């Protein structure tokens, strides 16, 4: 049974729109959430994913605001996070409402001028659902800076970015309030899914509101004001900003947006989201924001606001000095050609036309747009590591295969397609015997369902597992195919 604090009920009763009832709100909060996932189109199309999963008993109900998002139902009660297709990065387990902010930011107009969306910031990224959704919307083009303040959550963010094959991300670990100072007017678009009171999450956490207090709401709203101001300062003139929370009170939502408008006046232009998707008007406020109450779409509660920065605004602090000792250098023409030839000739992968960088004996792939950020801020991780160079030649890195071996593969690529049982064995770190012995082929890409799992060494009679030890799984769930009754 959901625990609703009486102080919360008293406060929210005054803010609930007239066309909604408190009884319906409480009833919605007591219902379990519908399961929802987002297909990772960096690796597989939604149609192909449905074709893959429907024989396993999955049914798909489209989420109206996300083209690749679905409410799903299936017979199994196992943890989906252990499913082979999830480990492989074919889908992300993501609550439907949390798909709204990237959709609001990347409206169709965002794609009409490609130059408009070269540098995007996700100010509070972990665990990575919205970051990887934006990476898919950007099709791994341009630069996506993903920031997370919590050190432990940065590790989770990095793991999800790699699993989903997002190759154009640069990860940072800072308090989001410093971005306006360090990266002033540097981004074409900014998403800030702000830390909040979490009032909208009560359907998955029955105790989320047990200790609710107005003092806590007031305190966190001050942090949110500082974050949205920092995000606004980091936004280029003409750029778009989306502010979102998974909470319901006005102080953390409309109040934060109104604060920004009070400080920066006409430089802040609110954009209506009433036409974002069919039925959006049911949750649209007078300002054009989306205030999603749980009973409207049978989802988590959520708030989404979009604004345009119409003019440059003064920076609050002097520009910081450039940082020195950046550990990467641009690869020479000879080095760049060497690594390109290795990927093309040995692996059948055409490297994207991006920056090839070198650090010691490591080769990395950076987005071209990252050049403008060198020395301006410390980054935890940039792009993807392609390979190590040793006296025996190049040794490809797992993350490069996961990110690049999908749509970049040539017909001559050395791949081995495996069954679901063999894929499970591979992900558990085991070698895979080959049914028919043949000539050893050296390094090969192991694939399941048309998407890569990683590398192996073809020894003629078996595939020697080259999966990094830290990625070996103790449990991999194979979702069984459903038999149709006559």
Swiss-Prot record:
Q: Which residues are responsible for catalysis?
A: 246
Q: Which GO terms describe its biological process?
A: rRNA base methylation
Q: Which residues bind S-adenosyl-L-methionine?
A: 124-130, 148, 175, 193
Please name the top-level EC class of this enzyme.
transferase
* Disulphide connectivity of cysteines: none
One MF annotation (Gene Ontology) recorded for this entry: rRNA (cytosine-C5-)-methyltransferase activity
Q: Which family does it belong to?
A: Belongs to the class I-like SAM-binding methyltransferase superfamily. RsmB/NOP family.
Q: What is this protein called?
A: Ribosomal RNA small subunit methyltransferase F
From the broadest rank down, the organism's phylogenetic lineage runs: Bacteria, Pseudomonadati, Pseudomonadota, Gammaproteobacteria, Alteromonadales
- Gene (UniProt): rsmF
């Amino acid at each position: 049974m959901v625990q609703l604090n009486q102080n919360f009920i008293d406060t929210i009763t005054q803010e609930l729109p007239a066309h909604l009832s408190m009884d319906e709100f409480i009833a919605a909060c007591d219902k379990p959430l519908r399961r929802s996932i987002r297909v990772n189109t960096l690796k597989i199309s939604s149609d192909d994913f449905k074709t893959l999963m429907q024989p396993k008993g999955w049914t798909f109900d489209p989420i109206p605001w996300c083209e690749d998002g679905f409410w799903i139902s299936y017979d199994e009660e196992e943890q989906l996070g252990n499913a082979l297709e999830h480990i492989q990065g074919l889908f992300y387990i993501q609550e439907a409402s949390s798909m709204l902010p990237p959709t609001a930011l990347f409206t169709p107009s965002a794609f009409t001028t490609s130059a408009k969306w070269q540098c995007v910031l996700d100010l509070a990224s972990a665990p990575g659902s919205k970051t990887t959704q934006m990476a898919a919307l950007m099709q791994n083009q341009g630069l996506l800076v993903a920031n997370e303040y919590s050190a432990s959550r940065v590790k989770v963010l990095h793991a999800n970015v790699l699993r989903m094959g997002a190759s154009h991300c640069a990860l940072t670990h800072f308090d989001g309030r410093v971005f306006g100072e360090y990266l002033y007017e540097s981004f074409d678009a900014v998403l800030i899914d702000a830390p909040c009171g979490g009032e909208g999450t009560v359907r998955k956490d029955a105790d989320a509101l047990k200790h609710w207090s107005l003092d806590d709401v007031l305190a966190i709203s001050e942090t949110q004001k500082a974050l949205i101001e920092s995000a606004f300062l980091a936004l280029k003139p003409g750029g778009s900003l989306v502010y979102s929370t998974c909470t319901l009170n006005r102080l953390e939502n409309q109040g934060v947006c109104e604060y920004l408008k009070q400080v920066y006046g006409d430089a802040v232009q609110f954009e209506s989201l009433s036409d974002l998707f069919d039925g959006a008007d049911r949750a649209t406020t007078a300002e054009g924001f989306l205030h999603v109450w749980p009973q409207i779409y049978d989802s988590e509660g959520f708030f989404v606001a979009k604004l345009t920065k119409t003019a440059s605004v003064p920076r609050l602090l002097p520009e910081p000095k450039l940082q020195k000792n950046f550990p990467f250098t641009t690869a020479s023409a000879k080095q760049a050609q060497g690594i390109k030839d290795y990927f093309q000739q040995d692996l059948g992968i055409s490297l994207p036309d991006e920056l090839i960088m070198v650090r010691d004996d490591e080769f990395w792939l950076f987005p071209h747009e990252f050049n403008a950020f060198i020395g301006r801020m410390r980054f935890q991780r940039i792009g993807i590591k392609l390979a190590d160079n040793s006296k025996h030649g190049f040794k490809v890195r797992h993350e490069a295969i996961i990110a690049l071996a999908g749509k970049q593969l040539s017909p001559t690529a050395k791949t081995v397609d495996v069954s679901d049982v063999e894929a499970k064995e591979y992900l558990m770190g085991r070698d895979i015997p080959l049914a028919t012995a043949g000539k050893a082929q050296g390094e090969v890409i192991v694939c399941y369902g048309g998407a890569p799992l990683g590398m192996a060494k073809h020894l003629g009679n078996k595939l020697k597992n080259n999966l990094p030890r830290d990625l070996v799984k103790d449990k991999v769930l194979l979702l069984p195919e459903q038999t149709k009754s006559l």
